[in-house]
Amino acid sequence: MKSDYDTTSEEAGPSQQEIGRWPLALFILHRCLAPYFARPEPYQRVLLYLQAVLSEIPRKNGWQIAEHAKQARPYGMQRLLSRAIWDDEGVRNEMRAFILQTLSHPSPVPLGAPSGTKPRIPFPVIVIDESGFPKRGTHSAGVKVQYCGATGQGENCQVGVFLTYVTDLGHALIDCALYVPADWCTDAARRQSAHLPETVRFQTKPELAQHLVQRALSASLPIRWVVADTVYGHNTDLRLWLEEQGFSSALAVPANEVVCVETAQGYRICEVASIERQRPGATLDWQRLSMSQGTKGERLFDWAIVPHVHRGIVDGCHFVVIRRCLDDPREIAYYLVVTAPGTSLHTIVLAIGARWWIEVDLENAKDLGLDHYEVRSYTRTLL
């Protein structure tokens, strides 16, 4: 979900030089996908489909994709995305491997900078976020009136949970899952009409996010940090699971999230919004730091870090990080952070700043037709 102060724009999209390299990369990728297609027709058609979505046609729907591919009717493209037999999970896994190869160094990038040098983002970072896709009808899998991040209000829409993978070489969406509301999961007729597999049960968005991160972990993706907004940070189970996997994490939480911190009266349980009032001397050590470079310049905020009690002790690994807007000091965000002892606040801030790359990736994906899809069934909805 995009913040009011986010500065991503068309300038954050791919450059003409990058676009010029797409055809060769596309042919290489297409060759990698061959084992996942049982017949030559859909395998050849998927190349035409990918060429169309990378083109500048105004809408990436069945008719316009077919016209770009010099096909008289859209039925072949529609069949490719709905009923044609091919291994969509295998294609997803191959795409993820292709992205990992593209965004990886031959040797690991050091976690921290040498003493006295400028901190840098602790790559690789996994970013979790969701996106909504407004719909007019009621038959697409999982559609209902619910919060839609694309419009900032309740809409008849589908919602997907997404992962972006960020390294110093670039960033890309690597996985997604369709959120299926509980009332859909218990409606046998709707399940049948949308081809929901029997294995699909209701999962909250944080549960879907955990499943996606587990899938990335099972695919041996190197991961150092996981960052996400309050939808995911407010979920205790997800936070604990990420810590159990050994990841550093910086997850936004609402102002009423409860922690135990040192106060003037000793250790007390309080809401994160009241930490400054509770602190001895009622002061925090604020530092003005940039979380990333935006299209309008450095994204500067004031930041403070406070250790909090975890399992009865202050262990030097668990913190509340507070971000205050320069233009309006009343605009404050809170993060629960788990990281290695000695990690600098600036490094944590840079990890948090990596979250905005998923906004860029979702914008670029929608430019390529992510929100133009016409598939109603569950299996290939977010292709």
Show which residues each predicted segment covers:
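Short amphipathic alpha-helical "interface-anchor" segments enriched in bulky aromatics
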Residues: 128, 132, 232, 277-281, ...
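Membrane-interface transmembrane-helix boundary segments in multi-pass integral membrane proteins
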Residues: 375-383
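An anionic, glycine-rich sequence signature occurring as long contiguous blocks
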Residues: 169-194, 198, 250-358
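Conserved, well-structured functional cores that handle cations and Mg-NTP chemistry
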Residues: 2-5, 9-226, 231-248, 255-258, ...
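Short alpha-helical segments used as structural interaction elements across diverse proteins
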Residues: 141, 202, 320-321, 352, ...
